[in-house]
Amino acid sequence: MDAREMKIKAAEAALAHVEDGMRLGIGTGSTAEEFVRLLAEKVAGGFRVEGVPTSERTARLCVELGVPLKSLDELPALDLTVDGADEVDPALRLIKGGGGALLREKIVAAASERMIVIADESKLVDTLGAYALPIEVNPFGLVSTRIAIEKVAARLGLSGELSLRQSGDGEFTTDGGHHIIDASFGRIPDAEALSSELNSIPGVVEHGLFINMAALAIIAGPAGARTLQANR
């Protein structure tokens, strides 16, 4: 079973949690896109959902495949969000934002009664941090914000390169008009402390640590999909 087949297995398992008539947050990334494709097949057969996309990219795919969409202002309370992750630890703490949609992903997840994370087994880790942590920042005062992030990291005993994410024509810009600093800390032993410290920096719009948000993680491997439940 290759990586895409594992993503499809995880998406299939998540789809079993989606009920007719649900208000659904729809994530961003390659695994979430497999979920959208499967959801679209059910919608074509008469299944009713209203989706809120977490990125313009997801919105375009949903429109292309016929998944009905609303804005979060139109559906401010959601039943369920299904989204991928860049890393998942045993406590269902996540690193997200590799696709650049972390702010909207977090807003949509917070507006949902439940969040289900879908991923292949390569994303399951003992401790977060091997994947660079995306930190969404305001373009104004970028150097000052970067220095503040470096100071936070030093206080917490973290080190590693901070890289301003690039795209084909310069700095990567999020759907909200912000930039992303990717922090390669290597290992984050206290994700809660780092989350709190980053939230205290005025120039940090949001970061990719999702803590106490996922209710379930569906992890797919060669033997199939298994479900991890949050213990809190």
From Swiss-Prot:
The disulfides recorded in the entry are: none
Q: Provide the alphabetized UniProt keywords.
A: Isomerase
Keyword Ligase in the entry? The reply is no
GO annotation (BP), single: pentose-phosphate shunt, non-oxidative branch
Q: What class of enzyme is it?
A: isomerase
Q: In which pathway does it act?
A: Carbohydrate degradation; pentose phosphate pathway; D-ribose 5-phosphate from D-ribulose 5-phosphate (non-oxidative stage): step 1/1
- Check the record and name the Pfam families matching this protein: Rib_5-P_isom_A
Which GO MF terms does the UniProt record name? ribose-5-phosphate isomerase activity
Q: What is its EC number?
A: 5.3.1.6
Q: Which reaction does it catalyse?
A: aldehydo-D-ribose 5-phosphate = D-ribulose 5-phosphate
Q: Which residues bind substrate?
A: T28, G29, S30, T31, D83, G84, A85, D86, K96, G97, G98, G99, K123
Q: Self-association or partners: how does it assemble? A: Homodimer.
Task of the protein? Catalyzes the reversible conversion of ribose-5-phosphate to ribulose 5-phosphate.
Family to which the UniProt record says this protein belongs: Belongs to the ribose 5-phosphate isomerase family.
This chain belongs to which protein, by name? Ribose-5-phosphate isomerase A
> What is the scientific name of the source organism?
Rhizobium etli (strain CIAT 652)
